[in-house]
Swiss-Prot record:
PANTHER family the record matches: GLUCOKINASE
Pfam short name (any one): Glucokinase
Family: Belongs to the bacterial glucokinase family.
GO BP annotations, alphabetical order: glycolytic process
InterPro entries: ATPase_NBD (IPR043129), Bacterial_glucokinase (IPR050201), Glucokinase (IPR003836)
Protein's recorded name: Glucokinase
Residues that hold ATP according to the record: 8-13
Amino acid sequence: MTKYALVGDVGGTNARLALCDIASGEISQAKTYSGLDYPSLEAVIRVYLEEHKVEVKDGCIAIACPITGDWVAMTNHTWAFSIAEMKKNLGFSHLEIINDFTAVSMAIPMLKKEHLIQFGGAEPVEGKPIAVYGAGTGLGVAHLVHVDKRWVSLPGEGGHVDFAPNSEEEAIILEILRAEIGHVSAERVLSGPGLVNLYRAIVKADNRLPENLKPKDITERALADSCTDCRRALSLFCVIMGRFGGNLALNLGTFGGVFIAGGIVPRFLEFFKASGFRAAFEDKGRFKEYVHDIPVYLIVHDNPGLLGSGAHLRQTLGHIL
């Protein structure tokens, strides 16, 4: 067996590749490529392997789209391929293609304390289920359970469940968005575009015309306290993040913890800490006490997708994480 395996984290814009030490799980030699510059994922992989002059026979790539069979067609990119054909073309012994939040969930057992910031709750209960979710371009969700010395990731499309308002303000938001877009999923309010939807709905609810703002604009104005509407939108985003996380905790009894990934929350960390997030997480009526001790963590590791891809592959190859 070779010392290293190839790991990757591929989104709509960029493909990030790295080497994983099969024995230790350590990630090294990470490099990001623009997906727009290459005709296929296989082409990017070949360039990476040629640049790093390393022999690799095993690989695991995390991709931001559902993985339901051999044929993979990326949701937000033109790349499409057969896993079996790519494995053959690259001369690999093993090639795993997994959902991006499967990778993030598999990273959790590998994380150290310095990679996490806790938001309330007690200590995690060893062996109990874990949930992970994260807002970015969309809303990713996965669960993780420990079975017979193996970690089993339970991926899905939980970001597309119905948005469930639990206040008068949230109900008005739902009514306005439903009139605009029809079905309103959680992702429609918990993502970069979702933050824009919240802002627009807040302004429209007051019979005013919203500005044409991007997520970055809303966040910057909210943090500068220069726009009341933006601050309300960001505050509501944090509250809905809490409600959604609490729902995940109830679904599977995630006493192993609820983990937040994705690139949005770290951009306004202090605002998030002071927000109504944790109160909303615990706002479960008769089951408030049930979720009270469930810890929530923000993942601040630079590359959980790469770390988790490596963990998934190593476990597939027989290593115990």
